[in-house]
Amino acid sequence: MIQELKADLNGKGQKHCVIVSRFNEFITESLLKGALESFRMHGVEDVTVVRVPGAYEMPVVVSKAAASKKYDSIVCLGAVIRGATAHFDLVAGESAKIGSIGVQHSIPVIFGVLTTDTIEQAIERAGTKAGNKGAEAAATAVEMVNLLSLL
């Protein structure tokens, strides 16, 4: 027998935490706006927004939020844009560790941190040509919460 589990996008009754970086705020505010609108469209009424200085600081906040057991999911939003130094690689690498926290705590942690080569690419992904990755991250969070409830 084959059983297929497929979650819907009904977020009614869910609690989400959005952790958003202040660094590159002109990008991250667009991501946050997209995420909050997406949550609203999917019936989510309970969202806590936590602002952190930058993407590098996210993992410890994600860990604390996950350990609190207050939220059904955690969505991370940020923008790391490549510069002329190795700083991009360091920050991108550290922020990528966020996913392991979700596995450790059995909570969906959605990675909505843009890692781009140029400012233009980041702008495109924050609500222009390439859609809004914040909105996509929020929809993914709703779906993952529902999927985990089916397991």
UniProtKB/Swiss-Prot annotation:
Entry keyword set: Riboflavin biosynthesis, Transferase
Binding, 5-amino-6-(D-ribitylamino)uracil: 23, 55-57, 79-81, 111
Annotated Gene3D superfamilies: Lumazine/riboflavin synthase (3.40.50.960)
Catalysed conversion reaction: (2S)-2-hydroxy-3-oxobutyl phosphate + 5-amino-6-(D-ribitylamino)uracil = 6,7-dimethyl-8-(1-D-ribityl)lumazine + phosphate + 2 H2O + H(+)
Organism domain of life: Bacteria
GO terms for cellular component: cytosol; riboflavin synthase complex
Residues that span the membrane, as ranges: none
SUPFAM superfamilies: Lumazine synthase
Signal sequence annotation: none
Residues forming coiled coils: none
One protein family per Pfam: DMRL_synthase
Enzyme class: transferase
Catalytic residues (UniProt): 87 (proton donor)
Keyword Transmembrane: no
Record: residues binding (2S)-2-hydroxy-3-oxobutyl phosphate: 84-85, 125
Pathway this chain belongs to: Cofactor biosynthesis; riboflavin biosynthesis; riboflavin from 2-hydroxy-3-oxobutyl phosphate and 5-amino-6-(D-ribitylamino)uracil: step 1/2
Record-listed E.C. numbers: 2.5.1.78
InterPro entries: LS (IPR034964), LS/RS (IPR002180), LS/RS_sf (IPR036467)
Gene Ontology MF annotations: 6,7-dimethyl-8-ribityllumazine synthase activity
PANTHER family membership: 6,7-DIMETHYL-8-RIBITYLLUMAZINE SYNTHASE, 6,7-DIMETHYL-8-RIBITYLLUMAZINE SYNTHASE DMRL SYNTHASE LUMAZINE SYNTHASE
Protein name, per record: 6,7-dimethyl-8-ribityllumazine synthase
Annotated organism of origin: Leptospira interrogans serogroup Icterohaemorrhagiae serovar copenhageni (strain Fiocruz L1-130)
